[in-house]
Amino acid sequence: MEEKAKAEQKKIGMTETWLKKHRLLYNGATRHPLIISIRDGTINTASFKTWLAQDYLFVRAFVPFVASVLIKAWKESDCSGDMEVILGGMASLEDEISWFKTEANKWGISLSDVVPQQANKNYCGLLESLMSPDAEYTVAITAFWAIETVYQESFAHCIEEGSKTPPELKETCVRWGNEAFGKYCQSLQNIANRCLQKASDEELKKAEVMLLSVLEHEVEFWNMSRGNV
């Protein structure tokens, strides 16, 4: 039975196996009530503004995390293509920060006055722990893939046919829900699967725990944005 499970994992990839295993939590992160409220057009403006301001702070903390993953790829990866994928993602973060500033201005948010809420601090703390030289590349790239994929899956749901996403939020949803970003997430997933296929049992355990931690932090971040913390 165990050999059959291992064969399936090899065929479909470890990340797919884990998402299947932890589907309830994954759905909680990608189909959160906040996302559903965007999709059906009932979102509270205050919730969106809270998310926007807090996510700006998160992205600023995300930059050094991605830089650390790039360094780990340089040191530990057996494929030079990894660095190119990660570097491409890192380069897009400058534009992302500019977008947040423009969007905040549009919504009347003074970003210099924004203070990180506890859920945000906790999530940024997780990123910081992954920046340690002791954190394995396999674990860090699994987290990176999961973080990006939750946003892609969530916001893609808001621009699917039949959605009633408010026009003023369409740009936000397209930013992460578009097909190109989906392909980028697929590239990260391919890297993660390759690393996990060669990982030790201990690394696999750490990576799975990290995936669960990312999903839990994503749910808490959405909860924070809705005000129910």
Curated annotation (Swiss-Prot):
One of its GO terms (cellular component) is cytosol. Pathway: Cofactor biosynthesis; thiamine diphosphate biosynthesis. It comes from the Eukaryota. Disulfide bonds join 158-173. One of its GO terms (molecular function) is thiaminase activity. The lineage of its organism: Eukaryota, Viridiplantae, Streptophyta, Embryophyta, Tracheophyta. GO terms for biological process: thiamine biosynthetic process; thiamine diphosphate biosynthetic process. InterPro entries: Haem_Oase-like_multi-hlx, Thiaminase-2/PQQC, Thiamine_Salvage_TenA. It catalyses: 4-amino-5-aminomethyl-2-methylpyrimidine + H2O = 4-amino-5-hydroxymethyl-2-methylpyrimidine + NH4(+); N-formyl-4-amino-5-aminomethyl-2-methylpyrimidine + H2O = 4-amino-5-aminomethyl-2-methylpyrimidine + formate. May be involved in thiamine salvage. SUPFAM superfamilies: Heme oxygenase-like. Coiled coil: none annotated. Belongs to the thiaminase-2 family. Keywords: Disulfide bond, Hydrolase, Thiamine biosynthesis. Its EC number is 3.5.1.-, 3.5.99.2. This is Probable bifunctional TENA-E protein.
